[in-house]
């Protein structure tokens, strides 16, 4: 897996300061690319991979896009997200709850809900 510095060397194709990781644009803001996510690229059984699996939730009356793959997920919850990424199956409420709590915490610190360079990757849940 590449280091954050190696990832930062990627070509900028989007808004100023946005690094293109090759995952396509965000659904709610096509000027911003999807990033690597807190766990990096997670392989799926279909040969593809997931990095963020974004969801939208309401924060203070605004619809906010955020990753459902967050460091507070346990192994079972991460498995549900991976299945949803492959099949479109619904996510359990616990994933939405943790995604929302994680996003609110990061926003309160002036951070994006999403992983950003130069953050380190989070170890996978066991």
Annotate each predicted stretch with a short phrase.
Residues 1-126:
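Charge-dense, intrinsically disordered terminal/linker segments
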